[in-house]
Swiss-Prot record:
Compartments in which it is found: Secreted
InterPro entries: Macin (IPR029230), Macin_sf (IPR038456)
High-level lineage: Eukaryota, Metazoa, Spiralia, Lophotrochozoa, Mollusca
Coiled-coil intervals: none
Source organism per UniProt: Aplysia californica
Keyword Disulfide bond recorded: yes
Family that this chain belongs to: Belongs to the macin family.
Protein name per the record: Neuromacin-like protein
């Protein structure tokens, strides 16, 4: 899985990291998936990958209260 692929291959800044965690892979934001933003799988396919999934990893968002979060990771 490629952690940068869901962000177009770029390193993420703090706000981008939080957006990626909150918009695609959290339960409380799931109501916006498909309406406000693409699902993890659809975003990865848009980027030319075979798909993607939310994987529990160390959090990259400095504003979260936990050290782990689900992040969208694209398949190669």
């Amino acid at each position: 899985m490629d952690k940068k692929a869901a962000n177009g291959g770029k390193e993420k800044g703090p706000l981008e990291a939080c957006w990626d965690e909150w918009s695609r892979c959290t339960g409380w934001s799931s109501a916006g998936t498909g309406v406000l933003w693409k699902s993890c799988d659809d975003q990865c396919k848009k980027l030319g990958k075979s798909g993607g999934e939310c994987v529990l990893t160390p959090s990259t968002c400095p504003f979260t209260r936990t050290d782990k979060a689900y992040q969208c990771q694209c398949k190669k």
